[in-house]
Amino acid sequence: MNFPSELKYSKDHEWVRVEGQTAYVGITDFAQKELGDIVYLDVTSVGQTIDKEAIFGTIEAVKTVSDLFMPVSGEVLEFNAELESAPELVNSDPYGKGWIVKVTLANASDLDALLDAAAYTTLVGA
């Protein structure tokens, strides 16, 4: 499994990539493998401010539907529109084209509570 060192990770299997005051959020390689083939994402929180650890949408796989938890507090600026027609990007490129939302980073200290790649690897037993 792949866990890029430049990202931060939540215990709920989301990742965060920070670019200035903006953060991209997606699910980890571990999460997409556990879920299986992703068939649909439902994110209706664009324009809303979501608290850290609150649900910002759902992800549907062939086997199950799971909640998506916000790893940092912030306003959801954008949903990755490519996922509407190609949700499988979450499986094939979870850290690149498969990002799910872009948010404003309300509190940079939220990042301090997240895991680095080594700690996340330990969490998932990889």
Swiss-Prot record:
This is Glycine cleavage system H protein. InterPro entries: 2-oxoA_DH_lipoyl-BS, Biotin_lipoyl, GCV_H, GCV_H/Fam206, GCV_H_sub, Single_hybrid_motif. SUPFAM superfamilies: Single hybrid motif. Disulfide bonds: none annotated. The modification N6-lipoyllysine is found at K63. It comes from Cytophaga hutchinsonii (strain ATCC 33406 / DSM 1761 / CIP 103989 / NBRC 15051 / NCIMB 9469 / D465). GO terms for cellular component: cytosol; glycine cleavage complex. GO terms for biological process: glycine decarboxylation via glycine cleavage system.
